[in-house]
Amino acid sequence: MVRSLGGAGRGSDRLKAWVPTLCLGLVVVLTLAYTIAGAIVRPNMYSDSGWGFVGWYTQARASAFNYSLGPDLSDISREVEAFMSTWTPGQHVLPGLVEKLGMNLGLAIIVVVAAFSVLGLFGWHALYQAFGFPPPTIWVALAVIVCNRFFNLSFTNYSGGESLLFGVAPWFILMVWRLREFRWFSVIPFVLGTAVLVFAKLSGMIFGAAVVGGAAICGDRAWAKWDTLRKLVVAGIAIALMGAIFYFTWYTRGVTAASIPTTLHPDGLLFYVSLGVTCLWSASLSLLDLGHYLFLNPGRQVLKSIDAVVYAFFPLAVATFTVTWIRLRHDYGEYLRFVFATCGAILVVFLATWMAAKSVSFDERHFRIPALLLFIGVVHAFITSQSWILRLCFAAVVGLACLYGVTSFVTRTIANSHYPMGDRGFRQMNATAEAIAYIRTIDLAGPDARKTLIFLPSPEIALEVRNARNWSNLADFDSLEDLKAMAYRGRIDRLYVFVQKKLLGNGKADAILRSFVDYPIDGWTMVPLGDMVCFYQIRN
């Protein structure tokens, strides 16, 4: 009996010794699989990224970096330029620069996504190691991350700054962690590092300030030490510089999500607190995304909103964080204080933004980076627990998230293979093959290109236009009232307006055509293009 128990113990030890190797193999295999599949099939693109690329391709004619050209609403024959304040520059600048090396945009996107995914994996490994977690815990966490939907999403659906922030954020956090003595020279790398975060994604400003503030107060008995005051002064100077630079060089120069008004949620602060805490728990596993898939899928919608899922997840999040704090408070106290202070600061900023009725969405992706900070602690607390109930609960939730992540990648890849390939080498999810082919027949080079305006129902479709001027809206998502409120004045020699066929019956197509107020409504010629149609008027 003793020999049997001893053998079992040695077998368990051997299994633990193999965990890092097995997880490393899974990380490498899946990352390569995502990259190869993305390079072969090519990704599609979300509209936010599409807007950025629309601006990127007009910058050669603009007066300065990050300015884009679009039609003058008072006279569409003219162009006006505007600072692109809504979208982070990194999401289109980096793939755009890679494209200039000679490859098409679709492949350039995969190169950038793969590079920042690998950079992020190395960064999170280094950061988790700096926190003092053992290799088995680190590799389990990384294997789970790679299996998740958020990690593989941009290999099929390019989401811009999310991948970039995943790649650079851990290195910034590691730098702050290494410099948490807060010598005066630390201000410069803190500010420069935050600038890199902002280049990757605008919310990097929030993360940078929160991480610096959290590191200033995470020391043992920090509240009882005078040195904490010095650290807070250094942190305050760094954060003030970050904020001032961001405010004057970016925020005041145009519209951002934090400056667009919207309506408050009916439940107010109760919902916002529940959502924020839930996202800090769910974002590392894409669990709210899973909730959307299960309960809000347009083809089989079960719930009217995600609210019920948020309220159901909230107690699970609180319980998870409580268990993590109790189990790690003795051996990882500084890590816990740093992470909870950082997450608390980020949560407060988002609560203030939501309560101010600003149009920051309710997506869990906004909390991905702080959630990944918490995730390594959660993994260690649960997989090292003596309680089989805790280990089983962890395995069940993580297993479900990983299954969803990998299968959703396969599903999205298959779906992409059926979308038409665009001229720039990425898949067009919202355009028909007939529409893409027709654009190529009307997008002619030469002196008449500047006298042609092609208006499209989503910005990523506008990237099919290489010569003529182009513009777009979000016809499928804009309300009918908003479309009716638009007015484009003036005339141009050739005007083409593309809309989805389904908009012909709900009044949106008519509203878009009537928004060109100097064109007679009975003067349009319609060309059917599969599930899309094109209306045009050409001046003789």
Could you tell me what each predicted segment is?
Residues 24, 28, 192, 212-213, ...:
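Signature aromatic-anchored transmembrane alpha helix within multi-pass, membrane-resident enzymes
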Residues 34-85, 95-100:
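Extracytoplasmic loop-helix module adjacent to an early transmembrane segment
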Residues 107, 124-148, 166-167:
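Transmembrane-helix signature of polytopic, membrane-embedded enzymes
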Residues 111-132, 171, 326-327:
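Transmembrane-helix motifs of polytopic, lipid-linked glycan transferases
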Residues 130-132, 136, 183-184, 219-233, ...:
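Membrane-interface helix-loop-helix junctions at transmembrane boundaries of multi-pass membrane enzymes
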Residues 162, 168, 200, 206, ...:
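Hydrophobic/aromatic-rich transmembrane helices and adjacent perimembrane loops
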Residues 228-319:
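Membrane-lumen/periplasm interface segments of specific transmembrane helices
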Residues 397-462:
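Membrane-embedded, lumen/periplasm-facing catalytic core of multi-pass transferases
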